[in-house]
C-alpha cells in the first residue's frame, strides 16, 4: 500500500513544486515506484520542472470527470525509471475537485505505487484540503521569513484538524523543510535563524535546502537539480534517504565569509 506524501506550504513561491519534483525523482531512483500528482488546479508548473510539459494530453480533472482512464493520463518519465506524473488542469474551475472523486483517485494510485507525492496548492487555496485529506506524511516547505512561517503555522493546524488520519485519531507525520537558506544573512542577523524557525513551528526538521542558483538554471532547462552534483542536489538526496527511514548524517552550512557559523549544531 502506497504512502501518500503531501508537499505543502503556507504561501506560494517558497519552492514547494521544486521540492516535489526533486523528491519524486530521488525516491524513484532509490527503486521505489513513485507518482507525482499536481493538485494546483489552474497554476500547474510541476510539469515544467520535471520537463514533461510537452507530453500532457489528459490531466487529473479529466480522470475525475471520466474523460479518460487513469492509465491514459499518467505520464511516465523516460529519464527516470519508476516515476510517473499526473498533471493538474490548467484551465478548469479551481473548485472542480470533489472529495469522493479524489478518494477514488488516491485509492487507485495506492494500488500501483509505493509513494504518491501530492503537490498541494499553497496555503488554504481551493484544493488544499483535498490535497491534505489522504496524507500519511506532510512535508511543510518554508523559507526563513515571517510571512512564510505565519502562513505555514495555519496550514499545520488545518492538517491536524481536517486530514483523514487526524479525524480517525491517527497522526499525520509532519516534517519541516527549510528552503533557500542563506548562511551569510543568518550570520549577520538579517535572516531568521534555524533555531527560531523550529521554535516557532514546532515540527521535526527533515532537511534544509541552501539558496542555490543551480536550481533556477535546472528548472529553466526542465532538468530537476537533484540530477546534478551541487549542494542543493545533495540536500534533496539526503531528504530522500530520510523519508525512506535512513539515519543520514546532517551537514552544517556555514557562511562563506569569516570564521563564524550561525548554524553551529544546526543541520540540513
UniProtKB/Swiss-Prot annotation:
It is a peripheral membrane protein. ATP binds at residues 11-18. GO terms for molecular function: ATP binding; ATP hydrolysis activity. SUPFAM superfamilies: P-loop containing nucleoside triphosphate hydrolases. GO terms for biological process: division septum assembly; negative regulation of cell division. The keyword Cell membrane applies. Gene3D superfamilies: P-loop containing nucleotide triphosphate hydrolases (3.40.50.300). InterPro entries: AAA_dom, MinD, MinD_FleN, P-loop_NTPase, ParA/MinD_ATPase. It is found in: Cell membrane. One of its GO terms (cellular component) is cytoplasmic side of plasma membrane. Keywords: ATP-binding, Cell cycle, Cell division, Cell membrane, Membrane, Nucleotide-binding, Septation. The keyword Metal-binding does not apply. Its main location: membrane. Belongs to the ParA family. MinD subfamily. Interacts with MinC and FtsZ. ATPase required for the correct placement of the division site. Cell division inhibitors MinC and MinD act in concert to form an inhibitor capable of blocking formation of the polar Z ring septums. Rapidly oscillates between the poles of the cell to destabilize FtsZ filaments that have formed before they mature into polar Z rings. This is Septum site-determining protein MinD. It comes from Helicobacter pylori (strain J99 / ATCC 700824). The lineage of its organism: Bacteria, Pseudomonadati, Campylobacterota, Epsilonproteobacteria, Campylobacterales.
